[in-house]
């Protein structure tokens, strides 16, 4: 089963010694019926798919995950942030780690406000890109599908990952970094939104919301 085909929690990709799991795996070598370990459990993906690659050379990593951590979204920035640092330590270098910020999912809402863990996961990914060495992020909120948590059309997401890598890693003139809002002011009956770089917007301007400093 390939790494792309699973949606385990991020902690499954962390490195950690788990004696209970190790004992069960050792027994399973001689008794196939004893193999009851959940393949996506804590540290299983690391030991099964990542640890064997330590020592090999590569340019960087692409990370598309987060849906399964929505139930513990507030802790995600620490879980994924620590995992990235652990991977860097394992290879002895701070290689590029490009995160796919979760795209949209489910039907459009009458107001541009989304509750639940997904928005927090997206904010955590942005925080990690700002604070963890080597971490970067591609924005995909305008992509995704209403009824499929795994969008079938992966090409646009791949193109954006490539653009981030070309701009941030290979230092080309590609544009991979999405613009960010730096200020929003109410002037009369209109909102004036300022971005950190020139943008070309298309649309009716109705699909956005403003959060106050108190979180409301």
Annotated model-derived regions:
Residues 1-216:
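Cell-envelope and extracellular/periplasmic
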């Amino acid at each position: 089963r390939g790494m792309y085909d699973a949606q385990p929690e991020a902690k499954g990709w962390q490195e950690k010694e788990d004696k209970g799991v190790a004992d069960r795996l050792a027994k399973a070598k001689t008794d196939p019926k004893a193999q009851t370990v959940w393949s996506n459990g804590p540290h299983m993906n690391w030991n099964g798919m990542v640890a064997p690659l330590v020592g090999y050379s590569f340019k960087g990593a692409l990370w598309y995950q987060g849906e399964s951590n929505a139930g513990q979204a507030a802790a995600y920035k620490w879980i994924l942030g620590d995992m990235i640092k652990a991977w860097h330590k394992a290879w002895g270098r701070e290689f590029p780690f490009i995160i796919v910020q979760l795209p949209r999912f489910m039907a459009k809402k009458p107001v541009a406000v989304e509750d639940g863990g997904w928005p927090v996961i997206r904010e955590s990914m942005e925080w990690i890109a700002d604070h963890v060495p080597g971490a970067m992020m591609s924005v995909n909120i305008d992509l995704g599908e209403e009824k499929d948590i795994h969008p079938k059309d992966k090409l646009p997401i791949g193109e954006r990952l490539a653009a981030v890598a070309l701009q941030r890693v290979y230092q080309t003139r590609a544009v991979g970094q999405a613009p960010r809002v730096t200020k929003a002011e109410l002037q009369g009956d209109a909102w004036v939104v300022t971005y950190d770089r020139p943008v070309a917007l298309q649309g009716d301007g109705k699909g956005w919301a403003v959060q106050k400093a108190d979180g409301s």
